[in-house]
C-alpha cells in the first residue's frame, strides 16, 4: 500500500510543470522519491522476517504435536490428585494429564482439549504437596486461556517483529502470566516454601520445553531466581488474579 502511494506521488510530481516547482520544494520531492525507491527493500525485509518467525512458530507447533507419540498415561495416584485439582479450579472440560520421558518441565498444550504434560521424573522427585502446587500452576494457565493468548501474542510479534516495543510488552505479558499462575499455586498449597522447592527441583532436571507451550520452567536462571525470591518474600497479589490477557 505504501509503495502504491509513493508511486502515485511520483507520477503526480512528474506531471507538474517545471516552472511551478520552487527551489524550496525540490529537496522534499527528492527525499520522497528516494524513500519510495527504498520501500521495496523494506517490504522484502519485512517478508523475510515474517517468514522466518512463522517457520519458527510452525516448528514449535509441530514439536508440540509430536509429543503425543511418547506420552504415557499418569498413574492412578497422580490422576486422583489431578482430578481433585480440576474440581478446585472449576475445570469441567476435557483436560487430560500425560507423562513424558523426554521433557523436564511441566507445560500445557491445547486450547479446547488441553493436556498437561509432566516429566516422568516429576512423579518420583516431587512430593504430593509439591505436585499439587505444580499442577495448580498449570491449571491456572488453562483457566485463564493463556495458551490462546500466547498464540495471539506470538502472531502479533511475528507481524510487528521490527518494533522493539512489541517485544518489550510481550516479555512483560509473559512475565505477568507466570506471576499470576505462581500466585494460584501458592494459594493452592498455602505454603510458598513447598512451591519454591518444587521449582528448584524441576530446575535441576531442566533440559528445555517447546517454545509455544505454556510453561513456568522455560526461562533463564535469573528469571527463575527472581520468581522464587518473590514467592518467598511476597504474598500473592490478588490484583493479578483476574487479568487473563496479561
Task: List the model feature ranges, each with a label.
Residues 1-246:
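Membrane-embedded and juxtamembrane structural elements of multi-pass membrane proteins
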Amino acid at each position: 500500500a505504501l509503495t502504491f502511494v509513493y508511486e502515485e506521488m511520483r507520477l503526480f510530481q512528474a506531471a507538474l510543470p517545471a516552472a511551478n516547482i520552487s527551489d524550496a520544494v525540490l529537496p522534499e520531492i527528492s527525499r520522497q522519491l528516494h524513500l519510495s525507491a527504498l520501500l521495496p527493500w523494506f517490504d522484502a525485509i519485512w517478508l523475510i522476517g515474517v517468514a522466518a518467525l512463522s517457520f519458527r512458530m510452525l516448528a514449535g507447533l509441530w514439536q508440540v504435536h509430536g509429543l503425543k507419540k511418547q506420552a504415557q498415561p499418569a498413574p492412578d495416584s497422580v490422576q486422583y490428585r489431578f482430578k481433585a485439582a480440576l474440581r478446585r479450579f472449576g475445570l469441567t472440560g476435557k483436560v487430560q494429564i500425560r507423562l513424558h520421558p523426554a521433557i523436564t518441565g511441566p507445560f500445557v498444550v491445547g486450547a479446547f482439549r488441553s493436556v498437561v504434560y509432566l516429566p516422568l521424573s516429576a512423579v518420583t522427585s516431587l512430593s504430593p504437596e509439591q505436585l499439587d502446587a505444580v499442577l495448580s500452576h498449570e491449571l491456572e494457565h488453562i483457566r485463564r486461556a493463556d495458551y490462546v493468548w500466547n498464540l495471539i501474542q506470538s502472531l502479533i510479534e511475528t507481524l510487528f517483529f521490527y518494533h522493539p516495543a512489541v517485544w518489550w510488552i510481550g516479555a512483560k505479558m509473559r512475565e505477568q502470566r507466570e506471576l499470576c499462575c505462581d500466585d494460584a499455586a501458592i494459594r493452592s498449597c498455602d505454603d510458598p516454601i513447598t512451591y519454591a522447592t518444587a521449582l528448584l527441583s524441576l530446575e535441576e532436571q531442566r533440559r528445555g520445553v517447546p517454545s509455544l507451550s505454556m510453561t513456568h520452567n522455560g526461562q533463564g536462571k535469573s528469571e527463575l531466581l527472581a520468581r522464587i525470591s518473590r514467592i518467598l518474600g511476597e504474598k500473592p497479589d490478588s490484583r493479578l488474579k483476574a487479568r487473563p490477557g496479561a
